[in-house]
């Protein structure tokens, strides 16, 4: 009711796939909504997260309209509580209307779906290239700082992990990071489960979960998305990667193929380092998986990023 939803509550369902926030699907006589409690251990200043989301959605919708596209149904619309689109009450809460006829899945199998996923991300980057990144808050300092996140492992016992692998990746990244170009507004967490699938067309229709939006490199978004959608049995599926790349570049964004390649390698190695760091130190960024599962995910990342 704090968000102005007056009609009767019917039931709720906890959605458990997210690593960070607590998410619930709320059914009421007024409609279906998605309610989230933001993890303030990860997002120390959640108000700034919502400021970034407001700025991003406003910018993209304006760009879409200028290009003759309809933004309706393409993004979550957050509901206000008073003057804000969030509520502070025993935590930090927000709610938005459930986008009808949509689902999320953890993996895409069909190359047509993967190609459309690439096009959706390419369109996102095309529209965010012109955004003024000085307007964005840094909500997670050091997030996707590849060199910093990998090099922090170097202080641990070299026998505790694959030191040589990370040293090779680190040196290669430092030598080639100029390829990445300039920073722009990016999503920073593009993966299959953050894409809505329209159940009528069976095609990706919207990107969600904008909490990590900050200035960054579009190549890292490309790499994150390709890692999530184009791997089978811990190996890159070239057919899927070609489909994803075809869709991405068809959207007209300006990223180079070399930058995309470096983004895929770097972001996957960084993810491996984060799983390993959590496992070694007992940190709890990935709150829904235990130490053993983190190690398994670390090894999975190693399998498809190990240099030849």
Where do the language-model regions lie?
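ATP-dependent phospho-/nucleotidyl transfer catalytic cores
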Residues: 44-47, 103-115, 132-187, 192, ...
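Active-site acidic catalytic loop and adjacent metal/ATP-binding pocket
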Residues: 19-28, 34-35, 173-220
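Protein kinase glycine-rich loop
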Residues: 14-17
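Juxta-kinase regulatory segment immediately upstream of eukaryotic protein kinase catalytic domains
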Residues: 1-5
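Conserved ATP-binding subdomain of kinase catalytic cores across diverse folds
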Residues: 22, 40-140
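Active-site activation/catalytic loop segments of kinase-like enzymes and analogous catalytic loops
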Residues: 219-252, 267-286
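Conserved N-terminal boundary motif of the eukaryotic protein kinase catalytic domain
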Residues: 8-12
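Conserved small/polar residues in nucleotide/adenosyl-binding loops
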Residues: 304-308
